[in-house]
């Protein structure tokens, strides 16, 4: 991150570590606009989630549309390329009549999870851009006090439209606003620590729904397997009742059982593959957010968390 250059004058008092210019902050100098650049605000259908949390209803609407498109494509592939055994096997796993009660919910949950994770990834990338803003003075001679805090706050508001919607800038704004109110640093460290815990809980809770989908999708697959087994065994039982010991009829009944097993295990395969892709995407995003958090912790400590570092700057 480049050293901060402050575009602000504070009366006749120069703030250590900041350079004064003749250009006051204004709406035209915004570097990031949450209301225009956040992916959910660009779509504009639903209220944007906090920080990196996606709007669940938006993800569900996208999932319904994607599920409809997916099954339409599968039906087309089956009708146009049924002679291809691979295409036929793939298509039937989804659109076989006995599988639909399982595959439709499983695919819907899959696209819901993937939509939420995609939106979350875009929001995380947008939040990370705040780290590149020249909002924080990093000169070694900078002294944090009530006067300099006001200048930094004005600088932050000149760079973004809504600092409270940025994970990093919201914490900084809260810290400096309290510093301006109480006129000291010692109590700010406690506020920062509480805010940091709230932010971490907010980020962690954004994975709760998709984590639930990771286990619920395979459960749907197992339900489909049980249904297939049940229907096959029931058909075989009826065959035994009417066969009268006829081996040919018994063999035919066993064939129905094996077909039921094949149908049942198709749903499990579909569900496990869906859950695998969801889990891989979750791990990918968690790694990205971990990198973001690491960079976040490496920003100036006097504005973030560590009370000893903060107090050492008080004069």
What are these regions (language model features)?
Residues 106-113, 224-228, 273, 277-284:
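Hydrophobic alpha-helical membrane-associated segments
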Residues 54-68, 196-230, 265, 269:
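Transmembrane alpha-helical segments and their cytosolic interface motifs
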Residues 2-199, 306-315:
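Large intracellular
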């Amino acid at each position: 991150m480049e050293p901060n250059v402050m575009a602000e004058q504070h009366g006749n008092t120069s703030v250590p570590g900041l350079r004064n210019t003749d250009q006051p902050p204004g709406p035209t100098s915004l570097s990031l606009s949450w209301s225009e650049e956040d992916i959910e605000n660009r779509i504009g259908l639903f209220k944007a989630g906090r920080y990196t949390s996606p709007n669940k209803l938006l993800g569900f609407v996208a999932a319904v549309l994607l599920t409809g498109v997916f099954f339409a494509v599968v039906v087309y592939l089956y009708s146009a390329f049924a002679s291809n055994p691979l295409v036929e096997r793939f298509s039937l796993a989804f659109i076989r009549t006995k599988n639909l009660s399982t595959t439709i919910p499983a695919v819907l949950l899959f696209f819901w999870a993937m939509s939420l994770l995609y939106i979350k990834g875009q929001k995380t990338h947008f939040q990370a851009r705040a780290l590149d803003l020249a909002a924080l003075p990093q000169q070694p001679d900078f002294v944090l006090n009530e006067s300099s805090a006001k200048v930094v706050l004005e600088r932050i508001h000149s760079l973004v439209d809504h600092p409270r919607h940025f994970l990093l800038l919201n914490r900084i704004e809260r810290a400096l606003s309290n510093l301006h109110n109480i006129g000291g640093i010692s109590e700010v460290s406690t506020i920062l620590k509480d805010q940091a815990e709230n932010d971490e809980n907010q980020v962690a809770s954004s994975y709760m729904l998709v984590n639930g989908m990771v286990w619920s999708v395979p459960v749907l697959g197992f339900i489909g397997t049980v249904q297939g087994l049940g229907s096959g065994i029931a058909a075989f039982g009826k065959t035994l009742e009417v066969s009268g010991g006829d081996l040919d009829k018994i063999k035919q009944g066993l064939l129905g059982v094996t077909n039921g097993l094949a149908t049942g295990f198709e749903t499990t395969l579909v569900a496990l593959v869906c859950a695998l892709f969801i889990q891989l995407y979750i791990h990918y995003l968690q790694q990205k957010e971990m990198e973001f958090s690491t960079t976040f912790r490496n920003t100036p400590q006097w504005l973030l968390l560590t009370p000893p570092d903060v107090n050492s700057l008080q004069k």
